[in-house]
Amino acid sequence: MPEKVVLAYSGGLDTSIIIPWLKENYSYDVIAMVGDVGQGDDLEAVVEKAYATGASKVVVADLREEFLTEYVFRALQAGAVYEHKYLLGTSLARPVIAKHQVEVANREGATAVAHGCTGKGNDQVRFELAYQSLAPELKVIAPWREWTLKSREDCLDYAEQHGIPVAASREKIHSRDRNLWHISHEGGELEDAGNAPLDSTWQLIRSPQEAPDHAEQVAFGFEKGIPISVNGTKLDPVSLVELLNEIGARNAVGRVDLVENRFVGIKSRGCYETPGGTLLITAHRELEALCLERDVAHFKQHVGLKYAELVYFGLWFTPLREALDAFVETTQKDITGSVKLSLYKGTVAVVGRESEYSLYRTDLAGFTMGENYDQKDAEGFIRILGLPARSRARARMEIAR
């Protein structure tokens, strides 16, 4: 009996040619594991293609709700954004796919797992650190680090030689990754950081010129930092994000063009479309501004940066991520309320925020005199606060004499 390998399969160019390559070079039975994270593909066609290219079995796992509730919303609560712009759409999808890939391998008695990530990118790290954390006994096969193919053009040649139909072409050479949270675009003209993305690069979000000429207001409801409603209607996580993707996209919200620092030390350029995510991270920040105490809010910014790094670097299944989750969960116990945003041609403006846990008080923040704040108290506060400054100034004056 041949050994079995479980391939994380998408039906794109890379994984389409990996099935016959694995059979040719390893003589494995190839089990294709398709993780549905909302990429919008015709899954029946993907399954048929996997069988047609040599898979002995195809397993489809609906991971959409788990992807959002256990990964995306945790990052949202943490305020995790990598290098100021990237909302980690691909980074968050890899651990949930790898987790289920390992589960399939254990269930099917496979001895190896495989992925289609290149040897230059971050995804190889994300998949393989997950494998090592969850099933260190499994052999890992990374064809891009083994085969003689050097480019996507070489992959297209291989596909043509083996009669494998692929959507990519020499004219459409972008590498794309899509899920419920975002679409990423790399390669082609984007490899030159001086090139603007072509209009055809963007798949989901309208340009500002094509967006409506009137603003659209959207109300968000949160419970303990988790989004639960849009415009007063409670929705399940998948429906909520899908609706916000539609709303953000038609208002030109969520396009990102980023030169980022990969974990492997290479700078890369990617374009991302995250319409719903951009709306949610903005609304969540506004609600936190209303409800979090100052020191917690400031410290949480550091936690958000570290959380984003952990996710981006593939360190999801680590004690530190779990520890950060515990801190974040504590900060979110009062993040319940509503936020209203106004969207207009790519801009997002907050127009209202409410919460029963709000720490904002008009009797303290307003300019009118009130019983709860005696302005005369500020004099003593400032003198105590300024003591080090006065001491330093006197010392310098003594030295100058």
Predicted regions and their residues:
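Nucleotide-activated chemistry modules centered on ATP-dependent adenylation/adenylyltransferase
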Residues: 2-8, 13-401
